[in-house]
Every structure is written in structure tokens, then in C-alpha cells.
Amino acid sequence: MQFQKEAFMASEHVQTIDLTNFSGRVFFLADPHGHYSTLCNLIHSISEPDEELIVFSTGNLFDYGPEPMELMTAINTGIFDGRSVRVFSAAGAGEEMLKKLLPINKDRRTYYPSTFLNERWCARGGRWHKQINRNYLEEEICKLLSTQLATVMKMLFKGNISIGICPSDYTDIRQGFNNTYNALLAFNQANVNIFQSQFLYGMDHAVRPVNVSDVNLVVLGRNPVNSIRKAHGLPLTNLPVLIGNCLHINTGSLYMSEISSPALLAPGIPPTTVPAITLVELILASTPTLICHQMILNKNGIYTQNTAPLNLDSNDNNIEATL
């Protein structure tokens, strides 16, 4: 799969992907947490070898999971167990810690040989990096950073459709998505730091139904959909849920792993009893629709795959914004 260089513009904090001429299949993914094999199984079950696939992720790609390095390698090569898949991801909290592995210069390493920040990351799912050759890992991280890991992403589709993606929440630094995007583009790191925790850990748009202007949809991760559903009195189906025009898609794949110290997890991440890896597919037709593809880990330890339309007009999946 080949993309023109101008099809994706990236800076340190924002990224635009122009898919107005893309004719393949488009998916959204939240918080895969290193479950590479499960994701590959889902991809193989819903696609054919000759199809063009592109996946946009909200971040939290690697930590806590069983195969973080396998997933990183697949993202960098664009090959998922023999299937060609292009992945672009925002930077979640795990990726922001991952970035600190890179030296500020060749003589100064933030995490070398061991620091409080490094141990804090290890305690929160990042210990896997200690098992990887440092030079090799730094090379792979540099490859990631050359194509992705911004705080805010914007996708442009035919029909003047635009979709934003953030790790956990969106916040209006300036009025409207486009002005906020441009502010992040102009900010230095110190200014970004003022707002970054809201993008990485926030949940305002999971609680309060608000329409973000300038985009048709904002896709968000981290906050589990069943906890959002419970807060709004919706059925606990573990399906993505639309709050305002913010689509929350984290279906709890974190809990496909054994979490030895759940108390260390950030507030707002309650256990999901029947977790799933979910790919939300965008079908661009005269009326755009969404299809939900899930690989579900049942309580008996057996995985099942399910595909169904995601009806965002249903009161079971939608809390509309109020003026």
C-alpha cells in the first residue's frame, strides 16, 4: 500500500491524514495494549489478503500486553501476520512515557541507567521495554515517531467529512477543533504540557454530551465504554457509544491481560468483565455508517468474533448533546 508523502502531515503534537483519494477500508482502534495476536486474528477474520486496510488508533498501544514489541514491529513494517495494514496512532499515556526512552542527546538519556520516571513507567505496564535491546528499541521508536504519535489527529475523507482522534479526551484550547489543532501546531512543549493531561487522561466528553465543532466526529479511547454506558444508564453491551459527537471505543482489551497491580491503574479504568479488541469500520457511502468488529474474550477463556452494524441513532448507543 503506497501513500503520497503529502497525504499525511505530521508535527510533534498534531497530525493530518488526507484520505480523500483512498478507496480501501478504514478502521478505528482503541487501546490494544500489546495484544498483537488477537488483533491479527481479528484482522484476518474480517478482511481479504488483497484489500487495502488503514487503522487509526487512540494510543496506549503496547503497555501491559503480551506482545508489545511484535505490535511495534508490525506498525513500523505495515505487515500484520502476512496481512498489509497501515496504522497511524495518537500518543496515549504509554507512548508519552515511551518517547522519553530516546536520548535528548547522545550523552544524556532520560531513563539511563534508571530513574524514578523509568520505574514509574515500569510499574504502570512498561516493564516490557527492559527485555529489549536498547539500541534496537530506540531505532524502532524513531521509526514510529517519524510517522505518528501526535496528541491530536485529524482525518480528511471525501464528501467533506473530517474526523478527529485523541487518546482519552478532547479539550478546546481555542474555540473549535480546527483552532485547537492550530494552537497545538504552534505551541512549544511547555505550552502543550499545560493541556496534555486532559488529552491523555480526561473524561469530560464521556460525562457531558457536547458537540465539538469543525469535525463530524471525535474518536476517543482509554475510558471504558461500559463505565460510560453505566454512568448514562445505557445497556452494558460493551459496544462503542456516542456522547455528543464523541465516539468512545475502548472495549477493555487491557483486561485481556493479567493485571498484577490493578490499584496502580489510573483512575477511571474499572475492570471490564468480558473484554474485547474492537475495530470500528467507517463505511463511506451516500450515508456514512459504522460497523463494529470485535474479538471477545469470554469468561470461559474462549475467544469469539462478532461483527454487527453500530447504530448510532439508537437510544442504546447515543446520548445527544443538549444546547
PLM ranges: what are they?
Residues 28-30, 55-59, 88-93, 218-223, ...:
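Active-site neighborhood of phospho(di)ester-bond hydrolases with catalytic His/Asp-centered motifs
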Residues 123-264, 270:
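Acidic, His/Gly-enriched loop-helix segments that form or flank divalent-metal centers
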Residues 1-74:
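N-terminal active-site segment of His-dependent metallophosphoesterases
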Residues 53, 83-87, 244:
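A short helix->loop->beta-strand "cap" motif at the edges of active sites that frequently abuts
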Residues 33-35, 63, 96, 170, ...:
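Short, glycine/acidic-enriched loop or turn micro-motifs at the edges of active sites
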Residues 64-163, 172, 194:
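Active-site neighborhood of divalent metal-dependent phosphoester bond hydrolases
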Residues 14-22, 44-48, 73-80, 153-161, ...:
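A short acidic-Thr-Gly-centered motif at the start of a beta-strand
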Residues 242-323:
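Binuclear metal-dependent phosphoesterase catalytic core
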